[in-house]
Amino acid sequence: MASIKKLMIRGVRSFSHKESNTLEFYSPLTLIVGANGTGKTTIIESLKYATTGSLPPNSRGGAFIHDPSVAGLAEVQGQVKLLFTNVHGETMICSRTIQLAQRRDRREQKTLESVIWAERDGEGVSGRSGDVDAEMPQHFGVSGSILESIIFCHQEESTWPLGEPVVVKKKLDDIFASAKYGKALDSLKSSRKECSSDVKMKMQELEFLRKMKERKESLELRIRSGCMSIEKNEIRVEACDNEIGRCERVIEEIDLELKGNEEAEKRAHLLRGEHRELMEFIDGFREKKLPLEDATDIMSGKSLQEAEEEYERMKMDAEESEMRFKDLSEERSRYIRSKAELDGVFSEISVKSSFLDEARRQKMEALKSLESELKVKKDFRETALEVFGKVEDDIKQRKECIHRLEEEALRLKKEDRDRTVALSEKKRIVDEYSGLESDGSIDVSVSYEDEVGRLRAEISRDREMEALEERLGDYQRRLNDAYSIAERNFAMNQMRGRKREIEGMLNGVNVSELKSKLERQKAKLREKESRAKEIEREMSLRKARAIERSKENDRIRRELRTKSMELGSMGQRSRMAIFEELGIPMLRNGSRCSVERAKEVVRSNEGFFARDDMGFGVEMLDLESLYDGEEVLQRSGASDGIWRERIYREMLEDGCRSHECPVCNKPLSKEEEVEFKRKLEAGIERALDGKENALGSWNDRERIAGEIEALNKEIAGRNKIREEMAELILRYEEVEDVSGEEALDEMELDMLDEAEGIKKTEFLIGLVEELFLIDGKLRGSEEGESVQELRSMVDGIRKIYEEKKEEVRRKKERIEYLCRKQEVIRAEREIREKINFREEAKEAMQRIERSSARIRASDVEEEIRRKKSKLDRILERFARKRVELEMSMEAFYQKEREEACLAKEIEELNSKVRKLLQAEFLDEAKDEVKFDDARSDLLERKNKVLEIGQKIRRMYEMRSLAEESMKYYNRERRVREIERELSETDFEYLAALKEKRRLLEEKKAKLSSQKSLLLGECKQIALGVKSYKQELLKDHGRTVENYNKCFIEVKALELSCMDLDKCIQALDKAIVDFHTSKLEEVNATLKDLWTNTYRGDDVDWIKIKTESSGQRTYNYKVVFVKGGVELDMRGRSSAGQKMIASILIRLALADSFASSCSVLALDEPTTNLDRDNIESLAFTLSRVISRHRRDADFQLIVITHDEDFVQLLSRGGPEYFYRLSRSESGDSMIVRHSIYGTREMGPNKVY
């Protein structure tokens, strides 16, 4: 059993690179204690690195090696040596050396040496790191995963049993060695796969040889049938020639008779086409035609010309009125714009005045606050220390005051900018209101910039909105008339434009004709939809009949397959009898004869297998090949008896001559030779008896062959009928499907055209209705202004104003919220600064108190002078700041005087604007009356023009209808003339002659095609017979012999595959049993450890549970049991429970899987444990130690910082324990101590 003896560490983490530290491990317990950061975990990392070669977690970049910057060197070498005893009792040493070099911009880490050697006779084995890594687990008798995850588990990974499911699965799979057993199983499967692939290849070869054998038989049959077919086709070609000559003579006679009637037929064809076109027009216009008298009167009338002249005259008058109205509108627009400009100036002046008042008030408040701040002065008549403290406080207050004043000054500047922006914004709003007549809408959108900047700009506009609210009533009364007139003019212009657009679209469109056409198209659409449904029903019926026919064909195929299988089974029985007599069952029942032995059997019976006429049963329903000459005797039971007799006699002669078994070449003793002769002679007698009994079986075969022949006839008849039916059905379905598809496509196109026409007609009708509605609106708007419409417009402006006001209110609330939040943040920052200042003051006082005893009187005086000079500088800066503030106040007073002058100018401008507005209001009423008269006159003239236009349109429609009616009557007369001319000509006799000629032509073409097919068939058959004969001579010389050899090889490979399958199943079952038994063993140990360790009553015990997610694939999880209920421990356990569970699971796994290496290292096992659980854990470990006390190789390594835990474990443990500490240079040291409290002294105190 393997064990570890000593460990030497140098240049690893905190251990010095100059001197080595040695640690000796005891049995059964080695205790290592030390404070945090002294290098306890480094011991576990070194053991793990020495045994597995893997570095600890998070050690990239050379963190595992002593830092070169700390050592003051460019390169540092770390070395770990381990003295241990392997599983064979040999003393071994493993040494690993690693180097870390500090370059200019990076660090380089590389392994210098990894060596393992034995101390016996100086023998050593050294090699690369990978060789040592693979060899160390073999010396310890466990796998590398057990060393990493159980024996020397790192502290950061100590709770892996309760970690991520993926990590738990990987580690437990490595511990159970699932991959190793899986590789063995995969190797067997790979062998089985290769064997199966060989079987498939041989089966393909066998299938190819079988087809070659069948090909040979088929070629012989085709040669015979080809010769007979050629003779039959020659007779049929001669009959076709005679019939073709007779048809040509009759066609010549018909052509002579048809040549005299060719002109009359052409004339009749032209008349029929003309008749069809005329009838289409007559049928389409029959319902809309006018009586002949009415149409004649309409065509000769002159009222249309007079109406057109009146329409042109009225249209010119309307255009002149419209030009006069446009001139008045332009003059009125210029007046409204000038009035709006005056209103804008007045509003701007009033708003600016209000802003100046507000700014003046805010400045007065700011000045008062500044004066109150500047008056804060105190006399400084205290001692130097008191003066210093007060000046510091006063300076802080002055800084805050200066900061507030700067903010106030910035705010005032911003207010000036805001007033300028507000005035420009008001001017823009007034300009927009003045442009209502041309635009017809008001743009009330507001753009915002940044979050707080935009909101503060909105608050400035809020003052503007308050001013607007006071003057909104007067402003609206002045703008109501202009706004309502502009709005109505804009709407009327839109309606007129829409009217002109609709009139253009409806020009030449007859509404009544469109409606009638729409009804006809809908009727056609419904008719075509019904026709499409009928076609779909017909197609579904055809599909049902096709399904019934396919079912009947399937039934016939099943009957044919049944009879074929019955005949094939008889041939199979005859084959099996031959193979049993040849000794092939020895290959199947035992493994003594291999594939090579089977080949030798074939070679020894080469004369038997080389026969071309050798057969293993009938596989084709070809009765001619079964009853033709010698083949009947060869395929009968009598020929089987002859073959068996011949084989038995040859085997008997070979065996007596060579005294060996002719099948497996085994030497025969005298007793075996006598028994061999007896069996072969008995076989010869059975073969002779079989010749007589074969005649009876042949009679049975004749009966079955008769049934097969009858069934073949029935099948041939049915196939012929089925082929004819299929040909007719395919032809019929092709024609019907083509016609049906064409009809459906045509109907779909017609339906789309009709639907498009319907949509277009409905759109035109909607346009006409919209035109009537617009006319009504225009007439209603021209009768007078509506008070309700004006009121709605005012309400719209008020609604826009309210929305704007609500939006400003929301922005103001948002600003208030942000300001409050900013104030809270500022208060928190000030509090933190005060706290920091207080802490700094406390620390300064403490430093002063600690150093006061050592400071001389001169130092104190120097400090006082320095403080006084600092105080003077602060007072000087304060005086300069006060002068600057007083100058700022003087500037504010100057600005206030300028604002007073500006207010006086604004008042003068207000008085002038009021006088101008009173003079212009008197002229406005006169212009409105004149404008209304011009507008009513224009509307009246346009209505008259519209009425005359509608009258002319109706007259044009009646005239076009009269023209179409005259065409109708003329074409009706022409139709009667064509019908009379067609009735005088007799076409029945000519049609009969043409039909007869067409049938003769078809018959002639069919006979010619049949003749060509027969000649081509004869030629192809002759070529085929020739090629068949050449193929028989060239490719089928040894076909049957090769088939028999391949058949034996396939059987031998199949037996090998069966043996591999049994081996795979046995190994698979063994893997599952091993996994189950080991897991039960681990859980039993884990239950015992938990019940004796854990002191809580919330968990009865824990166990590792597996869930199979596939074949040999397991998912693991740790569950705890409470009252018979299992719960997943991950996510439901405390940190202490995780630590106890992880330690106990490692103990249980080590007990089951590390029997060859009874070493276990526990790093800080008391982490997160309370006192009771620490004591119970110590008790459990003591029990484990006492249980393995007789085992000299059991070693438990415990690393902890808990002195009480060390005392609990040392009660029955070793006499010594190790304590880790730091030297004055910061390097870790290992010192051995006695459990009785004395430190071991001597030359080897540091190991």
Swiss-Prot record:
* Cofactor(s) demanded: Zn(2+)
Instruction: Please give the GO cellular component terms listed in this UniProt entry.
Output: condensed nuclear chromosome; Mre11 complex
Which SUPFAM superfamilies did the record assign? P-loop containing nucleoside triphosphate hydrolases
Question: Which residues of this UniProt protein bind Zn(2+)?
Answer: C661, C664
> How are cofactors bound according to the entry's free-text note?
Binds 1 zinc ion per homodimer.
Domain Zinc-hook spans what residues? 617-716
Q: Does the keyword Hydrolase apply?
A: yes
Q: What is its main location?
A: nucleus
Q: Which GO terms describe its biological process?
A: chromosome organization involved in meiotic cell cycle; double-strand break repair; telomere maintenance via recombination; telomere maintenance via telomerase
Give the family, as the similarity comment puts it. Belongs to the SMC family. RAD50 subfamily.
Its name, as the record gives it, is DNA repair protein RAD50
- Tell me the name of the encoding gene: RAD50
